[in-house]
Amino acid sequence: IPVPYCYRNLDGSMKHIQYEGDLLPGSLSITDYRSYDFQARRPDAIFIQNPYDEYNLTTSVHPFFYAANLKQYTDKLVYVPYFTLDEIEPENKKAFINMPHYVSMPGVAHADTVIVQSERMRQAYIGFLTEAAGEDTKQIWEEKITCNSRIPFLKTK
């Protein structure tokens, strides 16, 4: 299901919605988002790669695909970042400066599971979110945030 998106105007309003499903090769089996009934189908899991929802100032997925909305249609909303970052040492406070721009986002908060690139990045997310939300939330982040090496079929060397 190709997800529609848009660019934003300077005032934050959405320009017209872009849908690229019709640009994909005919050999691919795709489903138009307008014909897929999320409520009736209720997928076991939905994977998202865009955590920003309404907080991205330049682009946005269609609001239907915001994490808070998708969560109602599945028992397992999974966020996997579309980007890879340089490794962050959890004790390096300077590295935390940019983390609010990709960690404190709705996709992370609403996801049931967050899969990051490494154990070190997992610890950085947990440390940042615990510091931001309070020590009493640490277990929530420890259970929610995982990485490839913790998922048997994704283990990498």
Annotate each language-model stretch with its function.
Residues I1-S149:
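Active-site and donor-binding regions of nucleotide-sugar-utilizing enzymes
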Residues C147-K157:
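Short, conserved secondary-structure transition motifs
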